[in-house]
Amino acid sequence: TIEYPLEAEVRSLYASEYAKGKALVDAMNTYLGGALPDCEAVALALHLVNAGFSTGDLSATYTMTGVIQQMLTVIEGYYGITLDQNSVNVARFITHLRYLFVRIHQHEQLDDEPEPIVESIKTSYPKASDCANKLAIIVKMRLNVSLSEAEIAYLTLHVARVTSHATESHENDDTNA
C-alpha cells in the first residue's frame, strides 16, 4: 500500500473530489475483481483537482494543497480557534484560495481595486487584515510571489468571513464579513 503524505488534507480540503475518487476505486475493484486500496482515491482526487484547474502540473496541486493547509493552520493559531473543515465557510475559503492559486499561476492577480476600497477593508477588519498579511508572507515564502494589495484585501474579507462564526462570541474580533 502506498502512503500519500497529504492524504488527510486531500480528504478534508477536496472532499468532493475524494468521494469521486473513492467511487472510482470501488467501481474498479468491482469491475476488475481487484483489490485497489482506498488510499488510491487520494491520487485520483488530486488528478481531479488538477484537471479542474487545468494547470497540467500535479506538483502544483500538491504545493497548493500544502499551502492551503498551512494557511488554515496559521488562521487557527492567530485567532485561537479550530476551523470546521467540513463547514460551508471553510469550503468557500478554500475555493477562494484555489482560484487565488490559479491567478498566481496565470500571472493575473487582482490589482484594479481603488485604494480607498483597499484601505476601507484594512480599517474595517484590522485583525483579519493582519492575518491576511501573514498569509501573504506564506505565499511569498512558498511560491515566491508577492500578493498585490487588492489580493490581500480580498483575502482579508475571506479571513474575516471564515473566522466570523468561530469567533462571534469574542470581543474586538472582525466578525462583520
Q: Where do the language-model regions lie?
A:
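A cross-family "folded-core" feature that marks the main globular domain of proteins
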Residues: 1-177
